[in-house]
């Protein structure tokens, strides 16, 4: 089968994946690393004899063919912060029990790199298609997709497109994400002095904590709230 051609590049692909994972490409925090990840993909495309182009500060594409309809494959190279609870190095490739581990392997660096290698496999096989394939790469998907908004101000919309940014099965929609700012009035006896729950709104934090300064401390009420909720809770308090 033609699809098996990708297996010829397995070792080379895994080596490149390790390099791609090494970039701590958190948009808004590590913009230079986002640049490095995008430049790496475009450089590898050049190595393979493909046509790559940096289109905006946060996007680029690799094109195969120049006729017919334009088919886009959209992937992203940015990741959410890794957090502190990894059992393996998050920014390196680890193979364990038949699985690959590293921040971004599933979302979406693995698919981004496989897309590049699929174009390489097609090119090396001498396939002459009647349509144009374009792999589109962004580095701001996790922070609102401003990368694609700006990309399509300068580049045409594909006639057809998909993104390999999901588990197996074809999806045409995704659940939404609602970002809220909540404010409330506290009584004079209680002050919310600290509240921390990770570094990204679209990732489950490994740890969250709140600090209250209160002269009306009710341990039993807090215990009942904890028992009614999911997760593990730990209470530390001092009494003046």
Please provide the spans of the model-predicted regions.
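Acidic/His- and Gly-rich active-site-bordering loop/insert found
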Residues: 2-103, 124-129
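Midchain, well-structured core segments that form catalytic/ion-binding scaffolds
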Residues: 142, 146-240
């Amino acid at each position: 089968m033609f699809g098996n051609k990708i297996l010829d590049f397995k070792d080379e692909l895994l080596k490149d994946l390790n390099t791609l994972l090494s970039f701590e490409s958190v948009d808004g925090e590590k913009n230079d690393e986002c640049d490095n990840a995008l430049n790496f993909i475009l450089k590898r495309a050049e190595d393979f004899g493909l046509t790559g182009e940096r289109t905006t500060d946060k996007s680029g594409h690799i094109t195969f063919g120049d006729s017919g309809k334009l088919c886009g494959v959209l992937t992203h190279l940015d990741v959410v912060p890794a957090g502190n609870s990894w059992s393996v190095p998050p920014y390196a490739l680890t193979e364990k029990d038949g699985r690959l581990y590293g921040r971004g392997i599933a979302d979406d660096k693995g698919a981004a790199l496989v897309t590049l290698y699929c174009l390489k496999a097609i090119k090396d096989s001498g396939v002459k298609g009647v349509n144009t394939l374009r792999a589109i790469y962004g580095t701001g998907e996790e922070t609102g997709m401003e990368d694609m908004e700006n990309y399509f101000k300068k580049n045409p919309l594909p006639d057809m497109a998909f993104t390999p940014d999901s588990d197996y099965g074809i999806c045409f929609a995704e659940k939404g994400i609602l970002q809220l700012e909540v404010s409330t009035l506290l009584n004079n006896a209680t002050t919310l002095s600290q509240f921390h729950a990770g570094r990204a709104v679209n990732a489950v934090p490994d740890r969250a904590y709140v600090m209250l300064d209160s002269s009306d401390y009710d341990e039993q009420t807090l215990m009942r709230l904890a028992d009614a909720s999911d997760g593990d809770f730990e209470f530390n308090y001092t009494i003046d």
